[in-house]
């Protein structure tokens, strides 16, 4: 038929959708998985011996910045997608803080069309407020209709509770996820570095964990009140993990993301790496890091995302107070999950795969990829 058949032999299939974790063969017919089983053979197929390797569904990163449109000297949809594919990600969701903002259907369509030129699924979240100004709600109906993956003003907190309440009610009615960057500027003297031992040492204002905690508490209660599917983005504070845990027990449809930098690094990284370790919210203390890992262990935190946020070398070469916040992550995320979570025994490989594939897909209303059952996207990663 001219279709390229690939037979992956002896790989450990780890599928968070079905719970299958066993050594099996996988036959790929061009673009889809034809058969999964034992002792498979196929005439003319290219055979890959995957002994000692893992075969899993494509990874899903629901929090990336591809800087496109408007800041493509940092990254663009094509380079971002290449980094994603290299890291094992077959689907990403881009944030809306581009220039112009993705607060209208035209800009959304631009990203979708450029995304189709890549080898992965590039989805785009829409802003909650026009121009990310936090004052006027976007046309959520039109953006949902046009295929927005969800709604978020990521990068900026929504201080206007009335606006957020209306947005949550609309998100609930649309059954669309609403994702929130939680940093109250009242408690942020200088962004990007935790307020504490290191910020004092560097004579830098810093961002207090209270900035996150007060917003997370408010928005967990708004989520409980509205019933909206809400995601607390890139959680960084031990107290915030506990607040989400409590809200889940109360019955809120609230979810939380952790990034590799927040479960691997602490504020000491700023001394070692300078501006490269500057991000919003900042990496904090060892206690915060361990509480984030506990949150991943018990399911309080159910998504692992990169918050892949590239900048130019020139920008990061500026002094700490002037350099932009953000760190890249697509090519290192899986490795850090394996090294920092699975190898020390904090999570099983199955739990890691759920956090990096099934859970983010389901929260963003996609059908999660599976190796062992029929799914529209059965791309596998070795």
Where are the model-predicted features located?
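Histidine-rich, glycine-flanked metal-binding segment
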Residues: 4-58
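Divalent metal-coordination and catalytic microenvironments
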Residues: 11, 26, 31, 52, ...
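Metal-associated gating/positioning segment near the N- to mid-region
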Residues: 51-115
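Divalent metal-binding segments
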Residues: 65-74, 93-105, 126-137, 152-163, ...
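A glycine-rich helix N-cap at a beta->alpha junction
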Residues: 113-128
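Histidine/acidic residue-rich metal-binding segments in metalloenzymes
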Residues: 137-304
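His/Asp/Glu-enriched, well-ordered alpha-helical/loop segment
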Residues: 201-229, 276, 297, 302-304, ...
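Conserved small/polar residues in nucleotide/adenosyl-binding loops
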Residues: 381
């Amino acid at each position: 038929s001219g279709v390229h058949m690939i037979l992956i032999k002896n790989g450990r299939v780890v599928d968070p959708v079905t719970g299958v974790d066993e050594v099996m063969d996988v036959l790929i017919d061009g673009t889809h998985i034809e058969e999964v089983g034992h002792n498979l053979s196929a005439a003319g197929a290219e055979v890959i011996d995957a002994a000692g390797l893992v075969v899993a569904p494509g990874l899903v990163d629901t929090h990336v910045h591809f800087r496109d449109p408007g800041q493509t000297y940092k990254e663009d949809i094509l380079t971002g997608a290449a980094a994603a594919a290299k890291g094992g990600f077959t689907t990403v969701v881009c944030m809306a803080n581009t220039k112009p903002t993705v607060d209208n259907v035209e800009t959304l369509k631009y990203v979708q069309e450029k995304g189709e030129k890549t080898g992965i699924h590039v989805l785009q979240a829409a802003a909650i407020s026009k121009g990310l100004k936090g004052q006027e709600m976007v046309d959520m109906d039109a953006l949902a209709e046009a295929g927005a993956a969800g709604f978020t003003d990521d990068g900026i907190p929504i201080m206007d509770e009335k606006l957020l309440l209306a947005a949550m009610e609309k998100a609930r009615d649309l059954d669309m996820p609403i994702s929130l960057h939680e940093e109250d500027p009242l408690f942020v003297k200088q962004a990007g570095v935790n307020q504490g031992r290191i910020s004092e040492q560097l004579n830098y204002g810093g961002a207090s964990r209270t900035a996150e905690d007060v917003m997370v508490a408010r928005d967990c209660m708004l989520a409980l009140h509205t019933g909206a599917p809400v995601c607390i983005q890139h959680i960084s504070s031990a107290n915030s993990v506990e607040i989400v845990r409590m809200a889940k027990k109360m019955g809120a449809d609230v979810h939380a993301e952790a990034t590799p930098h927040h479960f691997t690094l602490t504020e000491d990284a700023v001394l070692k790496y300078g501006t490269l370790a500057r991000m919003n919210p900042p990496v904090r203390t060892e206690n915060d890091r361990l509480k984030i890992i506990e949150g991943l262990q018990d399911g309080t935190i159910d998504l692992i995302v990169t918050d892949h946020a590239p900048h130019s070398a020139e920008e990061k070469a500026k002094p700490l107070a002037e350099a932009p916040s953000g760190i890249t992550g697509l090519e290192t995320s899986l490795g850090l999950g394996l090294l920092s979570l699975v190898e020390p025994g904090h999570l099983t490989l199955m739990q890691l795969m759920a956090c990096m594939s099934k859970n983010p897909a389901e929260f963003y209303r996609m059908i999660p990829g599976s190796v062992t059952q029929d799914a529209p996207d059965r791309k596998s990663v070795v």
